[in-house]
Design a protein with these regions (language model features):
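Short amphipathic alpha-helical segments
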Residues: 20-25, 40-47, 62, 67
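Short alpha-helical hairpin
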Residues: 11-29
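His-Asp-centered metal-binding catalytic motifs of divalent-metal-dependent phosphohydrolases/nucleases
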Residues: 61-78, 82, 86, 107-116
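An active-site-proximal "capping" alpha-helix that borders the catalytic cofactor pocket
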Residues: 46-47, 81-96
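N-terminal amphipathic/basic-hydrophobic helices that include classical n-h-c signal peptides
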Residues: 1-9
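Hydrophobic, well-structured mid-protein blocks that either form specific transmembrane helices
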Residues: 89-124
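Divalent metal-dependent phosphate-bond-processing catalytic cores, especially two-metal-ion Mg2+/Mn2+ enzymes
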Residues: 11-14, 32-57, 70, 119-222
Length: 222
């Protein structure tokens, strides 16, 4: 992870060694307590994509980096309202005051709260749009794997067929035509990837076959 951040520090931004060390040493380890669909690797991916999107906007890179680091911490209190819990964690973390003003911290908290894909409202700021877009990792195999992993972690008593049906229903509800997935950054590649994924979702038999292969691979890990 440090190599990625060193690369980004070579461009004009305000990421400091102090903030990077704080995030990596104090914040990122908290993701190790979450399920595989929301683990440290996922957080790192969201951080990377968030930083890549900063090249399209005049934004505070340190804030974008911090938003991505905190966006899923509220999972420690459950999934249903994790976005609001994550925002509260930001507001209550006094350590952030050594890096940001109160106004910046409030913007960070708002963006963290706005990141969730099922939110009905548009993110309030460009920071919210960046984290929301970065968290939408539209790569079919990754999405299907994370969906299966989450099901195995949360619903261990389900049969194989029940897991597959749950995964199909979730993927259709979120990514299918008419699903609640919304994209906010026109410069990202997500719109093209989403349409490609929807073509796969349209063929439910193909979707189920792919999920069955992933289920067999992941089941051995649980």
């Amino acid at each position: 992870m440090r190599l990625l951040l060193i690369y980004h520090r070579m461009s004009k931004n305000n990421l400091t060694a102090g903030l990077i060390n704080f995030i990596e040493d104090e914040i990122m380890p908290r993701y190790e307590n979450f399920d595989k669909a929301h683990d440290r690797r996922h957080a790192f991916t969201v951080m990377s994509q968030s930083l890549q999107l900063t090249k399209f906007y005049e934004v505070d890179v340190a804030m974008v980096y911090t938003i991505a680091a905190y966006h899923d911490l509220g999972l420690s209190e459950g999934r249903a309202m994790h976005h609001t819990a994550s925002a509260r964690i930001v507001r209550e973390d006094e350590r952030l005051r050594q890096f940001f003003t109160p106004e910046q911290i409030e913007t960070i908290a708002d963006a963290v709260e706005d990141h969730r894909a099922s939110n009905l409202h548009e993110p309030r700021t460009i920071y919210g749009k960046i984290i929301a877009e970065a968290d939408r990792i539209i790569e079919p195999e990754t999405i299907m794997t994370r969906t299966v992993q989450y099901g195995l972690s949360r619903y261990p008593t389900l049969t194989k067929d029940e897991h597959i049906e749950r995964a199909v229903a979730h993927i259709k509800e979120k990514y299918g035509r008419g699903g609640y997935m919304r994209l906010w950054i026109p410069q990202s590649q997500n719109s093209v990837r989403l349409e490609e994924f929807r073509m796969m979702i349209d063929n439910e038999n193909e979707l189920k076959r792919s999920l069955e292969v992933i289920y067999s691979e992941q089941k051995a890990c649980y």
